Amino acid sequence: MNSGELLSLKNLCAWYTPDKPVLSDFSLDLGTNEVVGLIGLNGAGKTTFIKTVAGLLNGFRLDSAVWDGHAFSFRDKGFKKNRYIVFAEDRSFQYFTFQEYLAYVAASYGVPQPDVTELVKGFHFEDYTHVLLKELSTGNLKKTYLITAFALRPKLLLLDEPVNGLDFQSTEFLYQLISGYKEYGTVLFSSHILESICLTSDRVLVLEQGKISRIFTGKEIAAGNIREVLASEEDH
C-alpha cells in the first residue's frame, strides 16, 4: 500500500507541433510503493507522456510538478537519479555490452554496481551479458534495460510497453518483478496488453484523447471492464 505521494503533475500539456497537443490538461498522482498501469488506444499519448517525464520533449507546459514533496523539473539531476525509464524502443549505447552499460548507468546514478545474478537468470540472459547491444535481438535488448531497471531499484520506474519482444517465460518473470516492486518503490507502466495491466496493477489509468478519463482500482480492475471503456473510446 502506498504511504504518501511520490509524484504529482497538474494540467500537463505536451506537443510535437504547438497547434496539435498530444496531452491536454493531463493530471497524475502517484503514491509511494504502488504499481500503476497506463492503458489507452494507439495515439492516446502514452509514449509522449513518458518522453516528457524523461526530459526528452521540449514542447510542454504544466501548472505544477511535485516530486517527493518538492517542486521540480523533469531535467533536475535529483529527479533523474531517482527514476529509470525503459522505452518501448531504445537503440542507444549500441557499442556497449550489457556489463559495460550496467557499469555506466550505476556510475551515472552514483550507486555501486548491483548484483544482477538472479535477474540475468530469471530473464534467461546468461549467454548475452558480453554481447554488444547492437547485436542483440529486440527481446534481448529489452531484457538489457529491464534487468538494469530492476537492479537499480529507483523510487520510480517508468516502463513503456515492457512486454513487447519478450518470450513467455520472461514475460511471467517480468510480471513477478513488477508486482513485487512495491517493496522498493513505484512502477508506472504503459501497455496495450490487458493481461499485464490486470495481473500487476493496484490502479489502472485509462488515457483518452490526451488526458486520464477513467481510473480503476481494486476489484474494478478486470479485463472486461477496461475493454468496455476502450471500446467506447474507439467508437467516439
Feature annotation, model-predicted:
Residues 1-25:
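A short, flexible loop at the N-terminus of ABC-type nucleotide-binding domains that lies
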Residues 39-41:
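The feature captures the beta-strand-to-loop junction immediately N-terminal to the Walker
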Residues 54:
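Helix-to-loop junction immediately C-terminal to a conserved catalytic motif
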Residues 59-79, 214:
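Conserved ABC transporter NBD signature motif
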Residues 103, 113-129:
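Conserved ABC ATPase "signature" region
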Residues 157-161:
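Catalytic Walker B motif of ABC-type/P-loop ATPase nucleotide-binding domains
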Residues 184-190:
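Conserved H-loop
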